[in-house]
């Protein structure tokens, strides 16, 4: 039995799951948090750090040695400082949340004169290397005041890949095979066949060269190349005639001989017959070692080595040349006894390398390297050193080439080597053994006889010969995840490499001029690289903060786009499609609709990345048909070797598989296998889906396309005023809410000491207090009415009362879209599926007015409006209440500084911040000059540029922030805000100190009461300390007490030290905060002052708003109908929403119907509990009824709620929380069955069929037949008509065409396009059409005149020449065709 936490006891969700969960859902943000923690290694001792992340990047670039070699800069260690501002301050001030990185480096200068490398002097120093962004505990970064998420990238793993062109290159449709070595950084190396079966190579996708040039550049001769790639047939040449072949029977298979093949007189194969496998076996059995063949058999064969006349030294035939009659005669003449030829055939031993050597123009290693230099650097004259250096740097030095640990592992596995570790560069035995430097000797001694490039070419030839298979690049074994930490490390390394170049130049100066490390290193390149990555990389995205689910999903997203990834336009169908290997790793449902479909994926619930970055998913081990509780993670490559059963496979109590044939997966196929064959079993039915899809109840009854929409639309739900838990959920709502970080969870257990709307104080349990300095008090500040990235409202509400006992992890406060710690995205609405006067045509939704009245879908949106005062050429702008030509009424909401009051209710067009801008001097009329002379300068040299409420917006001012540049005097409002902020901080610190002090005194009291005194204030020696005595004593006098008991004396001293330490710490923290608040702000160049005004906008639901269920059943509200007109049930309850029944069958999302039935049952059970409470039923009866709800069926794992754990008060409290409906969980792919839903309906005393008689609200008549009615969790999506509705009379125009701009953001007009023109033409509305195309659009004079005419009350219109026609004329003139307009 599970024990229930304080939060869970408030409300338990009835679970219909039939399969016990072995593995808890892992921490959902682990992919982000763990990756960045490994990158920083901030809490790891310097000596213990692994070679990854910052440490790895610094170690790979240092030491930096000067060009002369007499000075070196070595890396010692690094430490991260404390961030200057905390997260809240960074959000407020628009700053980035990060910590300074300080690296300790050592400058070593060697003595030039000494013959050995003697150290002249060493200088060690700490160098500042810029700010490193810190991750918040919820996996986000704060960059320039906004929360951003670095999305993980799914890219092709480094390593070697074999592929073919699918017959698309050549017209014959012949498959051209290719191989590609992809490093983590460095040049790509490709090998490819051409249609004539010669093998070519490309470096970095440049022009192709015969592969033999690359091999020759490595130092191989023709003979060595042929020896590596071919098996040799040896022929002994008889002095007279005929040839003896050293027989390897297997090599004759498939050949047709022109002579009889005999064994001691008996013919094995007749002339002209093909040699088959049977003949080969006979030959092997006969034991013939040599075979006499005629000279013709040798003609046309290819020599494997040079044939040289031993006496004269003359070259008779070179390697790779064909044998002909003349050559055989020459061989006999020269007394050549034996020659070797290549064993090739057209079937499975292609002469590919031999063909390639024929087209290779180079002869020596240097020629080959020069040829590669010419290809890489066309136009540059090659020298010997340049060619050798370029070739070496391409693949053989770590500075320029890095396969990475992953790449080496994939490479070695693919070419069939045992060990997975190795060098990050490409290794070749011949090339490195010919070089004579220390590094090469080290590599040769370590790696010996292997050769990477040869192995790849051999592998490619094998595949071309029909042995071996090409790789599937869409398999997850060939795609890996690059998370935040790795990307940040790469960027950091790039910055360091830039620094390295500059340091190398300066190091030579350091020798002579005695520079320090700080003077050598300039941190700018590193800081710039990091800032660019976090601020503007394609994968650094503005966080989707609509609701907790959208945050979690955004952090768990995997994108195939981004630097080094795919592009939308070039990605084909295969990359986007669901692949067999996605099972349990990537969600098969959740992906965006539109151009990114399939390129952006979501991590499955249980998936994680392994040390190499490949996705892996957990499985339960099965031993001899018995399922164990041992869990193993397998990657996509590993799971290929095993037979894996589904999670819903039937087992008995001992875990033995009961079915005689179990449905399994093996190598991507679905099979039925006996239990003994099964190796593993899925851990959970929801293993294949992502968090968003796992939140859709009855997902198994929905069509995949609709499920996709349902998963995506949950992310767009706007948090409502009062969150309401879904009646029908899936059981992971609590996990999602907890991991998203929007709720406040107790860090340690204890008793609630204080609660108010903004703060919760917990007195920690004695057992959980760590160390002597820990006062055992946890203070949680709550977020109040803060704006999210999507302008929705983030607000936390406490759930606990003073005196409540909480344990670690309990939910103390709800955030947006959470209800008692469970995710609650929408509201439970009473729904009827029926047509209603055409108002639910085409997915429209009919809504009851009651929903609006009860504010069920009212949402609060917080808009941030900014007013900036800049320094202009004509003088500085000023924020003030003194604005020209504005009525008193317009200024009545502003204070004397010109800033709106908090709490003011404002509407579109109202002034929020008064601002005046200097105007350019214009020519003055004599009258103006006179007035100026009399009344002084000021009046007309400024214009009004105040911040006003944008059109279509109204709300209440809830916060104002004033930022003033350093050195500029703050106005009165800024001082007020400052004082308020300081007071708030002071109160916080005072309260904290008071609570801590109280806790220390309370603990001390328990330790000294009852002890005998030696000395003290107002007490005699030998008396016993009592509670009343301590109550009458001043707190400071407690410390004067001295007892006989040494332990008590120690406790008093310890308490005094603790209080003094806290006092000192709090004073220091307060002065730090105070100086932060009062210091000037760091504003953009040219900005003197910035005022931010926050408006809270209340949005009620209305026609045109978009709503949706969780099954992809979306629609737009068509009408809001009075309650009395809505269809109602027998007991008079009107329905809230009427949906179109025709929206269900064609969409095949039947899940919504099951949800409605079960939701109705849940609500009905809640009503029954309410009736019991109202009737003051006995607790025993209540317990019995709850037992009947939760524990009726023993097959359900989620059942067996142990109600005996609940005290009577706890049970009553839970029952009160259940009156609104008993929440149910129907887990994904393991949900409630039809019988269970019917049973619940019976228990709730509702019709088991789920349908009831409805009556027409207009007439009161019953409808013809019964209707499906029930409760569905319905969401309001962030597509609000208020945000889209927009009207324009006059506004901005485009400069070139003089037509109005488009779109709400530009305050644009509505386009009257080609088809609309046709419509007016069809009506014959000529004047309307003329007006549309001229004065209402781009006839400049006409529209100005029209405006004047309307003002004068003269309603005439004169249409002139549209500007777009002038543009057309100009465009035609640019083609040198002159068009002139003649007056008629």
UniProtKB/Swiss-Prot annotation:
Cited InterPro entries: DNA-dir_RNA_pol_bsu_ext_1_sf, DNA-dir_RNA_pol_bsu_external_1, DNA-dir_RNA_pol_su2, DNA-dir_RNAP_su2_dom, DNA-dir_RNAP_su2_hyb_sf, RNA_pol_bsu_bac, RNA_pol_bsu_CS, RNA_pol_bsu_protrusion
GO molecular function: DNA binding; DNA-directed RNA polymerase activity; ribonucleoside binding
GO biological process annotation, one example: DNA-templated transcription
Top-rank taxon, per record: Bacteria
Annotated Pfam families: RNA_pol_Rpb2_1, RNA_pol_Rpb2_2, RNA_pol_Rpb2_3, RNA_pol_Rpb2_45, RNA_pol_Rpb2_6, RNA_pol_Rpb2_7
Enzyme Commission identifier(s): 2.7.7.6
Keyword Metal-binding applies: no
Protein keywords: DNA-directed RNA polymerase, Nucleotidyltransferase, Transcription, Transferase
One cellular component term from this protein's GO annotations in UniProt: DNA-directed RNA polymerase complex
Swiss-Prot/TrEMBL catalytic activity: RNA(n) + a ribonucleoside 5'-triphosphate = RNA(n+1) + diphosphate
PROSITE patterns listed in its UniProt record: RNA_POL_BETA (PS01166)
Coiled coil: none
NCBIfam families linked: PRK00405.1, rpoB
Function: DNA-dependent RNA polymerase catalyzes the transcription of DNA into RNA using the four ribonucleoside triphosphates as substrates.
HAMAP family linked: RNApol_bact_RpoB
Quaternary structure and interacting proteins, as annotated: The RNAP catalytic core consists of 2 alpha, 1 beta, 1 beta' and 1 omega subunit. When a sigma factor is associated with the core the holoenzyme is formed, which can initiate transcription.
Family as reported in the entry's similarity comment: Belongs to the RNA polymerase beta chain family.
Protein name, UniProt field: DNA-directed RNA polymerase subunit beta
Gene that produces this protein: rpoB
């Amino acid at each position: 039995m599970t024990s229930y936490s304080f939060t869970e006891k408030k409300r338990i969700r009835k679970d219909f799951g039939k399969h016990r969960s072995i593995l808890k859902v892992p921490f959902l943000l682990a992919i982000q948090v763990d990756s960045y923690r490994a990158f920083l290694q901030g809490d790891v001792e310097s000596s213990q750090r692994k070679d990854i992340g910052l440490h790895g990047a610094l170690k790979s670039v240092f030491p930096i040695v000067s060009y002369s070699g007499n000075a070196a800069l070595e890396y010692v260690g690094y430490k991260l400082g404390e961030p200057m501002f905390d997260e809240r301050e960074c959000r407020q001030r628009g700053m980035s949340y990060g910590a300074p990185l300080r690296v300790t480096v050592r400058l070593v200068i060697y003595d030039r004169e000494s013959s050995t490398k003697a150290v002249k002097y060493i200088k060690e120093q700490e160098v500042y290397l810029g700010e490193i962004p810190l991750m918040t505990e919820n996996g986000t970064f704060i960059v320039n005041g906004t929360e951003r998420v670095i999305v993980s990238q799914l890219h092709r793993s480094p390593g070697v890949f074999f592929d073919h062109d699918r017959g698309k290159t050549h017209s014959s449709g012949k498959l051209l095979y290719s191989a590609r070595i992809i490093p983590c950084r460095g040049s790509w190396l490709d090998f490819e066949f051409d249609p004539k079966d010669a093998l070519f190579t490309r470096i970095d996708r440049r022009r192709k060269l015969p592969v033999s040039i690359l091999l020759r550049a490595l130092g191989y001769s023709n003979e060595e190349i042929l020896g590596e790639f071919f098996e040799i047939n040896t022929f002994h040449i008889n002095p007279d005639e005929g040839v003896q072949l050293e027989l390897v029977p297997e090599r004759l298979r498939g050949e047709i001989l022109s002579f009889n093949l005999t064994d001691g007189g008996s013919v094995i194969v007749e002339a002209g017959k093909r040699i088959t496998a049977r003949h080969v076996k006979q030959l092997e059995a006969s034991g013939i070692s040599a075979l006499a063949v005629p000279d013709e058999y040798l003609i046309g064969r290819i020599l494997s080595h040079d044939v040289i006349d031993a006496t004269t030294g003359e070259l008779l035939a070179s390697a790779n040349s064909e044998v002909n009659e003349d050559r055989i005669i020459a061989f006999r003449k020269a007394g050549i006894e034996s020659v070797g030829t290549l064993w090739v055939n057209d079937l499975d031993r292609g002469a590919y390398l031999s063909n390639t050597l024929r087209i290779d123009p180079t002869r020596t290693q240097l020629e080959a390297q020069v040829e590669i230099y010419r290809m890489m650097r066309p136009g540059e004259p090659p020298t010997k050193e340049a060619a050798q250096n370029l070739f070496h740097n391409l693949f053989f030095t770590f500075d320029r080439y890095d396969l990475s640990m992953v790449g080496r592992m994939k490479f070695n596995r693919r070419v069939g080597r045992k060990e997975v570790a190795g060098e990050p560069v490409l290794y070749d035995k011949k090339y490195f053994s010919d070089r004579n430097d220390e590094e090469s000797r080290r590599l040769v001694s370590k790696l010996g006889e292997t050769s990477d490039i040869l192995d790849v070419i051999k592998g490619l030839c094998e595949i071309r010969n029909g042995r071996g298979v090409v790789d599937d690049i869409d398999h997850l074994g060939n795609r890996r995840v690059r998370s935040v930490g790795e990307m940040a490390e790469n960027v950091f390394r790039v910055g360091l490499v830039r620094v390295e170049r500059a340091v190398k130049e300066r190091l030579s100066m350091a020798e002579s001029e005695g520079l320090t490390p700080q003077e050598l290193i300039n941190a700018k390149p590193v800081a710039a690289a990091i800032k660019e990555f976090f601020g503007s990389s394609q994968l650094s995205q503005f966080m989707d903060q609509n609701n907790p689910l959208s945050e979690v999903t955004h952090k768990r997203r995997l994108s195939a786009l981004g630097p080094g990834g795919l592009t939308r336009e070039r990605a084909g169908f295969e990359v986007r499609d669901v692949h067999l290997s996605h099972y349990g790793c990537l969600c098969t449902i959740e992906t965006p609709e539109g151009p990114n479909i399939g390129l952006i994926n979501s991590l499955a619930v249980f998936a994680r990345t392994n040390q190499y970055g490949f996705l892996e998913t957990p499985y339960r081990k099965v031993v001899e048909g018995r399922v164990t509780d041992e869990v193993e993670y397998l990657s996509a490559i590993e799971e290929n070797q095993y037979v894996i059963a589904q999670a819903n496979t039937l087992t008995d109590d001992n875990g033995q598989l009961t079915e005689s044939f179990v449905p399994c997966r093996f190598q991507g196929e679905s099979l039925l296998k006996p239990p003994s064959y099964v190796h593993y079993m899925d851990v959970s039915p929801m293993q294949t889906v992502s968090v968003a899809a796992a939140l859709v109840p009855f997902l198994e009854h929905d069509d995949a396309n609709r499920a996709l929409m349902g998963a995506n639309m949950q992310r767009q739900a706007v948090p409502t005023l009062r969150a309401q838990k879904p009646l029908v959920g899936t059981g992971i709502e609590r996990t999602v809410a907890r991991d998203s970080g929007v709720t406040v969870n107790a860090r340690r257990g204890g008793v609630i000491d204080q609660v108010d709307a903004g703060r919760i104080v917990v007195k920690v349990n004695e057992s959980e207090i760590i160390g002597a300095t820990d006062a055992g008090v946890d203070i949680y500040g709550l977020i109040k009415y803060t704006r999210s990235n999507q302008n929705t409202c983030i607000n936390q509400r406490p759930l606990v009362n003073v005196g409540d006992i909480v344990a670690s992890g309990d939910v103390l406060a709800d955030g947006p879209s959470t209800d008692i710690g469970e995710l609650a995205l929408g509201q439970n609405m009473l729904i009827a599926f029926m047509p209603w006067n055409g108002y639910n045509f085409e997915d429209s939704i009919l809504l009851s007015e009651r929903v609006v009245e009860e504010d069920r879908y009212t949402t609060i949106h917080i808009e941030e409006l900014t007013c900036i005062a800049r320094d202009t050429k004509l003088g500085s702008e000023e924020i003030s209440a003194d604005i020209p030509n504005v009525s008193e009424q317009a200024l009545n909401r502003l204070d004397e500084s010109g800033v709106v009051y908090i709490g003011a209710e404002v509407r579109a067009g109202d002034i929020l911040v008064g601002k005046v801008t200097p105007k350019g001097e214009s020519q003055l009329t004599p009258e103006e000059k006179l007035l100026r002379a009399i009344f002084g300068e000021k009046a007309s040299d400024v214009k009004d540029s105040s911040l006003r409420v944008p059109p279509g917006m109204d709300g209440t001012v809830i916060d104002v922030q004033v930022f003033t540049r350093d050195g500029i005097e703050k106005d009165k409002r800024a001082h007020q805000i400052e004082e308020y902020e300081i007071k708030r901080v002071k109160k916080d610190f005072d309260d904290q100190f008071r609570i801590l002090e109280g806790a220390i005194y309370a603990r001390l009291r328990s330790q000294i009461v009852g002890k005998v005194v030696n000395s003290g204030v107002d007490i005699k020696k030998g008396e016993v300390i009592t509670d009343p005595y301590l109550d009458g004593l001043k707190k400071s006098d407690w410390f004067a007490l001295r007892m006989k008991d040494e332990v008590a004396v120690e406790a008093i001293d310890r308490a005094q030290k603790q209080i003094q330490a806290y006092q000192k710490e709090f004073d220091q923290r307060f002065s730090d905060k105070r100086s932060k608040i009062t210091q000037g702000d760091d504003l953009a160049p040219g900005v003197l002052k910035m005022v931010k005004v926050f408006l809270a906008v209340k949005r009620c639901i209305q026609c045109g708003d978009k709503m949706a269920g969780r099954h992809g059943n979306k629609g737009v509200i068509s009408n809001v109908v009075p309650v009395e007109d809505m269809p109602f049930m027998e007991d008079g309850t009107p329905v809230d929403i009427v949906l179109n029944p025709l929206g269900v069958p064609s969409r095949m999302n039947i899940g919504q119907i099951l949800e409605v039935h079960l939701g109705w049952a849940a609500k009905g059970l809640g009503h029954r509990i309410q009736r019991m409470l109202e009737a003051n039923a006995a607790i025993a009866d209540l317990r019995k009824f709850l037992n009947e709800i939760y524990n009726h069926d023993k097959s359900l794992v989620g059942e067996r709620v142990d109600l005996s754990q609940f005290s009577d008060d706890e049970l009553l409290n839970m029952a009160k929380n259940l009156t609104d409906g008993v929440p149910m969980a129907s887990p994904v792919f393991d949900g409630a069955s039809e019988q269970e839903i019917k049973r619940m309906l019976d228990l709730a005393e509702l019709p088991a069929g789920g349908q009831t008689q409805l009556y027409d609200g207009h007439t009161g008549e019953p409808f013809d037949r019964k209707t499906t009615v029930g409760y569905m969790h319905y969401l309001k999506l962030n597509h609000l008509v208020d945000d889209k509705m927009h009207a324009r009379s006059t506004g901005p125009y485009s400069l070139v065409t003089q037509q109005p701009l488009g779109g709400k953001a530009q305050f644009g007009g509505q386009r009257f396009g080609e088809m609309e023109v046709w419509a007016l033409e069809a009506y014959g509305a000529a004047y309307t059409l003329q007006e549309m195309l001229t004065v209402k659009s781009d006839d400049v004079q006409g529209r100005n005149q029209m405006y004047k005419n309307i003002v004068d009350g003269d309603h005439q219109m004169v249409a002139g020449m549209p500007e777009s026609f002038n543009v057309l004329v100009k465009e035609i003139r640019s083609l040198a065709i002159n068009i002139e307009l003649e007056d008629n």
